[in-house]
């Protein structure tokens, strides 16, 4: 619980406003993202209840993680062909400001 509180504080200090995940419902390149959502989304949302985390599915789209910060700044991380564990690490990097 303390780790979740610490990561919430870190995200707030970085000015993180929103996370968006884009993925394809069927493509093999999005499989790790789909697995991440099934296995870890609920835990992530519980750890960050006030952070909007948007999941967007679209046919043939390349899987990406978008982080929107204060003053309209955005960072993009490709999630193509990553495993669920690698997607988790990418998400942790965004939440800690390393992305």
From Swiss-Prot:
| Modified residues annotated as N-acetylalanine in this record | 2
**Endpoints of the signal sequence:** none
BP terms from Gene Ontology: aerobic respiration; blastocyst hatching; proton motive force-driven mitochondrial ATP synthesis
What positions are modified (N6-succinyllysine)? 64
Gene3D superfamilies cross-referenced by the UniProt entry: Glutaredoxin (3.40.30.10)
Q: How is it modified after translation?
A: Acetylation of Lys-64 and Lys-75 is observed in liver mitochondria from fasted mice but not from fed mice.
A Gene Ontology cellular-component term: respiratory chain complex I
User: What disulfide bonds does the UniProt entry report for this chain?
Assistant: 24-58
Q: Out of the domains of life, which is the source?
A: Eukaryota
Q: Where in the cell is it found?
A: Mitochondrion inner membrane
Q: Which UniProt keywords apply?
A: Acetylation, Disulfide bond, Electron transport, Membrane, Mitochondrion, Mitochondrion inner membrane, Respiratory chain, Transport
DNA repair recorded as keyword: no
Question: How is this protein positioned relative to the membrane?
Answer: Peripheral membrane protein
The chain residues annotated with the modification N6-acetyllysine are: 64, 75
SMART domains membership: L51_S25_CI-B8
GO molecular function list: NADH dehydrogenase (ubiquinone) activity
Asked if the Swiss-Prot or TrEMBL record annotates the protein with the keyword Transmembrane, the reply is no
The protein's job, in short, is: Accessory subunit of the mitochondrial membrane respiratory chain NADH dehydrogenase (Complex I), that is believed not to be involved in catalysis. Complex I functions in the transfer of electrons from NADH to the respiratory chain. The immediate electron acceptor for the enzyme is believed to be ubiquinone.
Family under the similarity heading: Belongs to the complex I NDUFA2 subunit family.
User: Subunit composition?
Assistant: Complex I is composed of 45 different subunits.
The protein here is known as: NADH dehydrogenase [ubiquinone] 1 alpha subcomplex subunit 2
Task: Write down the species.
Answer: Mus musculus (Mouse)
């Amino acid at each position: 619980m303390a780790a979740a509180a610490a990561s919430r504080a870190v995200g707030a200090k970085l000015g993180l406003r929103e996370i968006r995940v884009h993925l394809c419902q069927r493509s093999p390149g999005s499989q790790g993202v789909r697995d991440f959502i099934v296995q870890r989304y609920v835990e992530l949302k519980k750890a960050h209840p006030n952070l909007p985390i948007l999941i967007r599915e679209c046919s043939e789209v390349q899987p990406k993680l978008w982080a929107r910060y204060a003053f309209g700044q955005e960072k993009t991380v490709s999630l193509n062909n990553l495993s669920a564990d690698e997607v988790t690490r990418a998400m942790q990097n965004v939440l800690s400001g390393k992305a």
